[in-house]
Every structure is written in structure tokens, then in C-alpha cells.
């Protein structure tokens, strides 16, 4: 009996030693895991509120993760205090990301609804580093936009783009993705608003369509109507970057909804929770939708497939991209 007891004790000690070793490996990781999410909104817009609601839904789906969600808006700046690693800050919009970037550098921050140039500028200005500072970039991958163009205009060979100060940095990527799909990219630079329509007309003389790349120098509420009307006179389509641009007269656009961005943010929050200082690099929207303007298509004599059919074909060939 004594021998049996000694053997049993020895076996138990071995098991306990293994357990302690395993716990020793995992405790440092989970000790720093954040327990909550603080969402900072630039404003209480419908898009931001929809994002918040969907994020809560997505987080609730994971029964193994119980993250409390706190929501504040920029006017409540005195409330923008978080317990460093114990909370993930999700900033909605450029102004919100700017405010969140001023928190302690150890605080994990994830941006959304933020263009890539704005993210890079904020990160450099506030000396933040990748790892605990990231974002779901607002811009859609050029590969995805070219895919939409080829599905809508399969015979297209030349696509024009207007380049401003911000969008000029993308030209090499646009050309690369265009070449992959047999599209020759034509570009004209716009340095001031007076050059906008003349440069657009140059493109419309040769291009089969225009791809709009977000740039404050070129695309705004004030310039939308003259751009769309000019392209219509030339009987050439505009491929926009938002639902509102399609409603205004663009032929098509690929975009991500607030719910889709919230789903992606929730996935990042859950995956990175054990290691808050290990956020993924900035990434393009993973989930997306498309919108077509059938009235514009009829006016331009462009036959279109069903919206769902085009989306299905795009999804089959689409792959999410990191920056």
C-alpha cells in the first residue's frame, strides 16, 4: 500500500508539474488580455450607431469572450480615459482616431471609417507604432474595384483616373491591378479645382470609363454634379466609391456597410484579446457589397447582370488584403 501511495503521489506531482508549466506559459498572455472595448465616435451618425449595435451583436455571438462595451463621443473628451491594456479602443472616424492616438502608447487602438493617408498621418504625428495601433481602412482594394469594372464592362480596355495630391500615391497600385485584368490605366493630374473638368474631358475622350478614387482635391459635394454630368454627356460611366455616389449618378460602386466593418472589428477584437499589443497590421475591408444604378446603365446602353450575380462572381475571386 505504501508503494502504491508513493507511486500515486509521484504521478500526481508529475501531473501538477505539467499543469503548472502549462499555466506558466499561458498566464503571461491572458494576464494582459483586455476585458472591455471602448468605442469612440466622432459623432452620433446613423452609420456609427449601426456599427456600435452590430459590434455588440458580433461580440455576443462568442460565448467564450465576455467583453463589456463602453461608448463615448468626442464632446465627452473628459471620459476618454481607459485602463491602458485592459481596454481596446475602437475609434470611428478620423477625428475619433486622432483623439484616441493621444492615449498612452501602450493602449491598443483600432480605427475604422478612416482612409489610409489619414491613418498614416495620425500614426506618424503621434508617434504610434504598429502592434497596438491599427485600423480597418475605409478604402476598398484596387483589385476589388478592377474586378467590379470587368464584371460590369467586360469589353473595357482603358480606364481613366483623376489624380490629386492624396490619390497620386496610389497610381502604381492602380496600374498593377489594372494590368492583371487587361485594363490600361490613363491618368490626369488635378492640382486645382479649375483644372478638374478640362482634365476629366481629356480622359473621357479616350477612356471607356472613369474610376473615382477618394481625394478631397477632386471629389466633394460641390464637384459631384459637374463630374457626373460631364461623363454623362460623353456617354461614359463613372465607377464610384460609395452608395451615395451611385445614387447621384455613378454606374456602380463597391463599398462596405457599417455592419460589415463591425463584424470585421469584432473578429479582430476577439482574436487579439489575449495579446493587446499584437493587433494585426492595417487591413482593407474584408466584407463588402456592391451597388448598381440600372437607370444610368439604360441611359448609357450598358447591359447589366443582376447585382447579386455580379457580387457572387466577385466573392469567388476576392481575397482580403492587409496593408
Feature-to-residue mapping (PLM):
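Short hydrophobic alpha-helices and adjacent helix-cap/hinge residues
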Residues: 31-323
Amino acid at each position: 500500500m505504501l508503494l502504491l501511495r508513493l507511486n500515486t503521489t509521484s504521478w500526481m506531482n508529475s501531473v501538477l508539474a505539467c499543469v503548472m508549466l502549462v499555466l506558466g506559459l499561458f498566464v503571461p498572455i491572458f494576464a494582459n488580455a483586455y476585458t472591455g472595448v471602448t468605442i469612440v465616435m466622432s459623432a452620433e451618425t446613423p452609420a456609427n450607431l449601426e456599427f456600435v449595435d452590430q459590434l455588440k451583436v458580433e461580440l455576443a455571438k462568442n460565448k467564450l469572450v465576455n467583453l463589456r462595451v463602453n461608448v463615448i463621443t468626442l464632446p465627452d473628451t473628459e471620459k476618454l480615459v481607459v485602463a491602458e491594456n485592459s481596454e481596446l479602443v475602437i475609434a470611428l472616424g478620423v477625428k475619433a482616431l486622432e483623439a484616441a492616438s493621444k492615449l498612452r502608447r501602450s493602449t491598443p487602438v483600432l480605427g475604422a471609417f478612416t482612409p489610409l493617408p489619414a491613418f498614416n498621418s495620425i500614426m506618424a504625428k503621434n508617434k504610434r507604432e504598429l502592434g497596438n495601433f491599427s485600423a480597418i481602412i475605409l478604402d476598398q482594394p484596387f483589385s476589388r474595384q478592377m474586378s467590379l469594372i470587368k464584371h460590369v464592362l467586360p469589353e473595357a480596355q482603358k480606364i481613366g483616373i483623376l489624380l490629386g495630391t492624396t490619390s497620386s500615391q496610389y497610381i502604381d497600385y492602380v496600374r498593377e491591378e489594372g494590368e492583371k485584368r487587361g485594363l490600361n490605366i490613363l491618368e490626369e493630374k488635378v492640382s486645382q479645382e479649375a483644372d478638374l473638368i478640362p482634365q476629366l474631358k481629356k480622359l473621357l475622350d479616350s477612356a471607356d470609363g472613369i474610376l473615382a478614387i477618394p481625394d478631397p482635391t477632386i471629389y466633394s459635394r460641390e464637384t459631384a454634379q459637374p463630374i457626373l454630368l460631364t461623363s454623362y454627356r460623353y456617354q461614359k460611366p463613372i465607377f464610384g466609391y460609395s452608395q451615395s455616389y451611385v445614387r447621384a449618378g455613378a454606374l456602380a460602386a463597391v463599398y462596405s456597410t457599417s455592419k460589415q466593418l463591425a463584424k470585421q472589428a469584432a473578429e479582430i477584437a476577439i482574436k487579439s484579446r489575449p495579446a493587446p499589443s499584437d493587433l494585426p497590421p492595417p487591413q482593407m475591408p474584408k466584407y463588402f457589397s456592391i451597388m448598381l444604378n440600372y437607370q444610368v446603365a439604360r441611359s448609357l446602353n450598358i447591359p447589366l447582370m443582376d447585382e447579386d450575380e455580379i457580387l457572387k462572381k466577385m466573392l469567388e475571386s476576392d481575397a482580403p488584403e492587409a496593408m
